[in-house]
Amino acid sequence: MKRFFIAVVIILNCSFTSANAAVMKNTKPLIELTYSKSDQVSSVALTPVSIIISGTTESPSSAWINGALAGSSDGFIASYSSLGAPLWNIRLGNTANEIATSLAIDLDGSIWVAGASSALLTPNPTTPPVKALNPDNVILDPSVPISTPLNRIKIWQISSTGNLLNTFEYVGENIIYPKKILVTETNLIVLGNIYDKSSVGAFYISASKTGLFTPIIKYGSKSTQINSAISNKDGSITAVGSSGELLLKVKPLSKVDAVTLKISSSGVLQQVARATLKSTTRSWGSIGAGLLQGGRVNYSNKTEAAITKFSALGKPVWNVRYLAKSSALVASGNTSWATYTSSGVIKGVPAWKPKSPTPVLIEFGKKGEVISSHTLTSPAVALAVNNEIGTVVITDSGVAFGLVVVNQ
């Protein structure tokens, strides 16, 4: 009788485990947006009825971006319905080189896009010597424009119907790479990185909605980067990235730590929280509402995708790490979502044993348990969630961007 009771308990436990385990489902893009050069989608944002993407194109022409390439690269923004139908698009470029790296939707429905641009400089003409040899009578052109590095922060304002409303510019000294634009009631805040030879430092800059910029504020100067950020209810900012140098008298714990920075609304660095593991380099690559953070851990012989939910700066509620070939992108809604390229088992998805690295999308509950899991046809480059549309993933196969929607 005792053995029978134990057997029944084991069977019931196995039944509950199987019932609670997530099953990996396959997804397919609603549409695919083809390209021919090194194009990128950098950001996605959602309205109750539309999906808006922004990025950079180097393709000479495009079936889904109006107009032809002006410089070596143009920024772009495009809007689609929740079913993948094209609504509008606009090319953000002129004869200089532009990139578009982040977008945010304002309360009035207009869209702000941050990026960077170069400038075209015309060199001073020089008069060739009178006796210069020119047997073929070649016509000399001394005024071929020269492109500067991407040292200008660019901000574009676009209406909800796809009309360009304003363009603002801040000229810097070195190569500059905006990573995130945040919108408040009165201001725009751009965070990112500044490159000087072999060093990199993070930056903060604010602008009014009429294009008046404050002085730029820098954090670190050797090996500090900001990759993403969110606005907090008190007006402060939580930014995530990596650093291998002293910040606010907080020393690095390894060669490169994942860092979370609390920054005041005026750009003052207030707190620094570092995450590290022995003999690793770490970085946070994204952050969602409610302090859901995603990144990567690099060991000498493997890489892990890291996903952590915090209650406050440096105070984790739950965290998971999975064998991976990429960093983790995260987004928050009623639940927590993460996407990465999986190269190993996933706790909570017992049948998942990939034979080769495979992009996946995972949904987590309040305690970090896996609720649902999905495969993607290509690696994800952008992720967003809202209640009306669901979870939206932009994938990149190397020849086309895919628009994937998972309804909650």
Please place each PLM-identified region on the residue numbering.
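Bacterial N-terminal signal peptides
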Residues: 6-15
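A sequence-level/structural motif corresponding to short, flexible coil/turn segments enriched
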Residues: 20-408
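Positively charged n-region of N-terminal signal peptides that target proteins for export
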Residues: 1-4
